Design a protein with these regions (language model features):
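Helix-breaking motifs and short loop linkers at transmembrane-helix boundaries and internal kinks
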Residues: 10, 42, 63-69, 80, ...
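Central cavity-lining transmembrane alpha-helices of secondary-active solute carriers
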Residues: 21-35, 307-320
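Conserved MFS/SLC helix-loop-helix module at the cytosolic interface between two early adjacent transmembrane helices
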Residues: 29-68
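Cytoplasmic helix-loop-helix junction between adjacent transmembrane helices
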Residues: 73-112
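Helix-loop-helix hairpin linking two adjacent transmembrane segments in secondary transporters
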Residues: 108-158, 172-223
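Juxtamembrane intracellular "pre-TM" segments in multi-pass secondary transporters
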Residues: 157-199, 224-268, 293
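Extracytoplasmic gate region of multi-pass secondary transporters
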Residues: 188-214, 225, 263-318, 377, ...
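C-terminal transmembrane helical hairpin of 12-TM major facilitator-type secondary transporters
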Residues: 332-380
Length: 473
């Protein structure tokens, strides 16, 4: 949709990129608190309201007349989607606790890929015939129906949450002193990021995107630091914070502390940010690339790109999940290996996709790129779930969404747009994507050194906590 939106609203490539980042930044910042709400209250309700909000915002985007209006709609879409992935994957983890977990999450990822590609496909057809505004409207309406279906989801093994009134009273009793104490790291890091951004603004020739990136990175580090301090306190039932969260974190004190001190998560978070930069940067600019470089119409882009990307993405998510689970049965690093290898193998294929001039090769290269780039969809989330106690799975997945998107693909669309504006060549700008994807795959593979030990520690902790609970009963 980039090209018709650009013509209608008279936008630059950098502004187009920021439309993507509005969605990603808000999604990133909202994922962690919504993940916590899902763990504390109800994952089903987080999913239901999330689907409703992002569907309504998508529909509203069709009536936007100015850049800031469309920017706001995209931000609301990000807020709606923020709680969906952590809560959904946590519910899947409740149903699939054994060796088929990566495959189950892979099927979930297939649904997301299917919806995304079909949205591009049908959206292109609708935009060609009726305009991009109607494409937004028609893509948003079905989600409102799906929100009603989501309200029927059933969660397993959930303890009833404390009454909302009791929770609010506890939060009020703690007062602003407790809030200030807990979020001080966030304020410090965000302040440093803002100061650096302001310093860069004093120099001519440095684009504002870099200042925004510094502020975003500082904020994400501050949130991670805050969670590092807050969660271990919250799980201690003897503290005031523990009185609020005890219903969700009951008997998982040692496990929750372990989550935030697990080396595997460090490599997964860092590598996840890089591969998210590569994947979503490609998704954001692929249609515009095909229109500008290869001269395809909006409708043909939807068909050409949609068919090949859908086939590759679905096959890659299924094959990656199945392969990871098979390898995991023989070796603890199977899921990590599958996640990282897809990007190491996929980077040269993606580079060839961007450099090829013959359209006869373009379709197969799209298929191969998406096939390899979607191996990680199920396995990477499964690795996180493997080293995280069940009571805080949605919270930790929310933290992963926060960091990977804010430090990853929140930067990709505007940075590619900025490089395209400066070089005058979108192809050259997009070659950054496979390079970052390759680096991210290599970083993920470093977790092969630590994942077996981390899984054993969490498994032994879970057995210890379960045995202790049985003894007390």
């Amino acid at each position: 949709m980039f090209e018709p939106i650009k013509r209608d609203l008279h936008l630059s490539d950098a502004q187009l990129g920021w439309l993507g980042s509005a969605y990603i930044i808000v999604l990133s910042l909202s994922a962690l608190p919504l993940g916590v709400i899902g763990d504390l209250r109800s994952r089903r309700l987080v999913i239901t309201w999330g689907v409703a909000v992002w569907s309504a915002a998508t529909t509203a985007g069709g009536i936007a007349r100015q850049f800031w209006q469309l920017f706001t709609c995209r931000a609301l879409v990000g807020f709606g989607e923020a709680g969906y992935a952590p809560a959904s994957q946590a519910i899947i983890a409740q149903y699939y606790k054994g060796r088929r977990r990566a495959f189950a999450i892979g099927i979930y990822s297939v649904g997301m890929a299917l919806g995304g590609v079909l949205g591009i496909w049908f959206g292109g057809v609708i935009a060609e015939r009726y305009g991009w505004r109607w494409a937004f409207i028609w893509m948003g309406v079905p989600g409102l129906v799906l929100a009603l279906l989501a309200s029927r989801l059933r969660e397993l093994d959930r303890r009833p949450p404390p009454p909302i009134a009791e929770t609010l009273r506890e939060w009020w009793r703690h007062g602003m002193h407790g809030v200030t104490h807990y979020v001080m790291p966030l304020a410090i890091c965000a302040g440093i990021g803002a100061a650096l951004a302001g310093f860069l603004s004093l120099f001519e020739g440095i684009p504002s995107q870099f200042g925004t990136a510094l502020f975003g990175i500082g904020t994400s580090v501050g949130i991670a630091w805050t969670v590092w301090r807050l969660v271990p306190l919250a799980v201690r039932r003897t503290t005031e914070a523990g009185a609020v969260a005890a219903g969700a974190f009951d008997d998982f004190q040692d496990a929750a502390i372990l989550v935030l001190r697990t080396p595997t998560l460090i490599w997964i978070f860092l590598g996840g940010a890089m591969v998210t930069f590569a994947v979503n940067g490609l998704i954001a600019w692929a249609a515009a690339f095909m229109e500008r470089i290869h001269g395809l119409s909006v409708a043909r882009v939807g068909g050409q790109f949609g068919l090949w990307a859908l086939t590759g993405g679905v096959a890659g998510a299924l094959v990656g999940g199945r392969m990871a689970d098979r390898l995991q049965q023989r070796w603890r690093g199977g899921r990590v290996l599958t996640s990282g290898a897809g990007f190491v193998l996929g980077a040269p294929v993606c580079a060839a996709l961007l450099l090829v001039h013959d359209l006869r090769w373009f379709g197969p290269l799209i298929l191969a790129t998406y096939f390899l780039y979607t191996w990680y969809n199920g396995p990477l989330a499964a690795v996180i779930l493997d080293v995280v106690p069940p009571a805080v799975q949605a919270t930790v997945l929310g933290a992963f969404v926060l960091f990977s998107h804010l430090a990853g693909d929140a930067l990709a669309p505007p940075l590619i747009g900025y490089l395209s504006d400066r070089t005058g060549d979108l192809r050259t700008a997009m070659l950054l994507l496979p390079a970052v994807g390759l680096l991210g795959g290599l970083v993920i593979l470093i977790a092969l050194r630590t994942v077996a030990r981390d899984v054993r520690r969490v498994t032994s902790l879970d057995i210890h906590v379960s045995g202790q609970g049985e003894a007390e009963s």
